[in-house]
């Protein structure tokens, strides 16, 4: 797992961010959703499944344009049954247990493309986000 910039990690999935502060994009290869997820919000459910869950997306107030694009991308992936590709964002300094409401633009991060996982949006109601990532066989 190599440390990358977010732009490099997105390029690993042939996805291009619309703007410098966007954390989701659609892959030009297969239309899958590519998302950058905070590592501390990933939970190991066992059996090779990791869950990314945000209880209240409305707390993401520092960057409403990127939040709205993320919501659009989540709706697309859920409605079109598209795969979700994972990029893990980790704080370089001290991870906060609760990241909601924090301006992520001010946090020093490193990114890791997690190509051995494929996800699915299992819940998205406008506020609650739940994506399950399964380990790909033979990875």
Segments predicted by a language model, with ranges:
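Short helix-coil boundary/hinge micro-motifs
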Residues: 1-138
């Amino acid at each position: 797992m190599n440390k990358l910039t977010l732009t490099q990690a997105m390029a690993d999935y042939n996805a291009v961010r619309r703007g410098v502060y966007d954390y989701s994009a659609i892959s030009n290869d297969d239309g899958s959703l590519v998302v950058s997820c905070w590592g501390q919000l990933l939970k190991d459910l066992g059996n090779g499944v990791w869950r990314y869950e945000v209880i209240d997306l409305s707390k993401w107030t520092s960057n409403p344009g990127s939040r709205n694009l993320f919501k659009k991308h989540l709706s697309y992936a859920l409605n079109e049954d598209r795969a979700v590709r994972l990029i893990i964002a980790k704080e370089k300094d001290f991870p906060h247990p609760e990241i909601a409401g924090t301006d992520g633009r001010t946090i020093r991060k490193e990114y890791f493309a997690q190509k051995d996982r494929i996800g699915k949006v299992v819940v998205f109601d406008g506020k609650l986000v739940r994506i399950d990532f399964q380990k790909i066989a033979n990875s």
